[in-house]
Amino acid sequence: TPTPTPAGGMAPMIPAVKGDCPRFANGTITFMGLGGIKVAAGTKAASPGAPFVFYWHGTGSTSGEYSGMAAAVVQGVTSEGGVLVSLNGSTGGDALSGTSVFGKGDLDVGDQLVACAIRDHNVDPKRIFATGCSAGGLFATNQTVLRSSYMAAAAPNSGGMAFPQAFQATGVPALMTVHGRPGGDVVVIDFSQSSMTADNAYKKRGSFVINCNHGGGHCGGGGLAGDIWKFFKAHPYGTSPSPWKDALPAGFNSACKIF
């Protein structure tokens, strides 16, 4: 059943807790058989309003990648008593991440992390987001499609979609794609193109979409982490229309345009 929330808009469908939950505190944990999972957590909020962010790393990288790529996101999340989780390994990689760094089974791990954080750390069911770089950017985009019943928004840094995916029956998550110039953000695929593929898929769904071409190279969007955090804050689950539907807020990165 939908999780009731005090705010308006549609309610996300949160998975049930199954089995033991981890302790949400800064450090490295093993959960559901996966080691090396990094957790950045703020002091538990007094009421259920905190954010939760998945960070998915790139090929050949590790779960600690977020500290450099998404520093402003981590700071924002933890300052509000929220949780950022970054998996290191996979239950079994597949094409959802492009290079089999992560795979569909990891979505089940994500389901439990979300369910546990809502129950145990006062995370707001409407504030579940995903970001990541390269293979992780592809996976963040696809996770949000395949878990649109509760994911509020995705903001991949050189990510998008290499091939179409079907959204779940419910949910219209927002999207902010960050990428380099065409021909300059290429590792096997052109991430400006995969970003455009995702932009079009989400737009067709009815989502609010922002496209940010920073003009640089692969995973060069770390400087937009502050803008990603603003985007997440403004787009909890079910936000429609976007408060930014007519214009991006003052001071937002000029590389970004409403799609």
Regions found by a protein language model. Give the residues of each.
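Mature extracellular/periplasmic domains of secretome proteins
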Residues: 71-79, 143-144, 165-167, 199-201
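Solvent-exposed, polar/charged alpha-helical surfaces in well-ordered, non-transmembrane soluble domains
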Residues: 108-115, 119, 145, 196, ...
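Cell-envelope and extracellular/periplasmic
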Residues: 56-63, 118-121, 133, 140, ...
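A domain-start/cap signature at the N-terminus of enzymes
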Residues: 1-52, 83, 102-105, 131-150, ...
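Serine-hydrolase catalytic machinery in alpha/beta-hydrolase-like enzymes
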Residues: 18-24, 30-40, 48-127
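Soluble non-cytosolic domains of exported or imported proteins
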Residues: 47-50, 100-108, 145, 189-193, ...
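The feature captures the conserved acid-bearing segment of alpha/beta-hydrolase catalytic domains
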Residues: 149-229
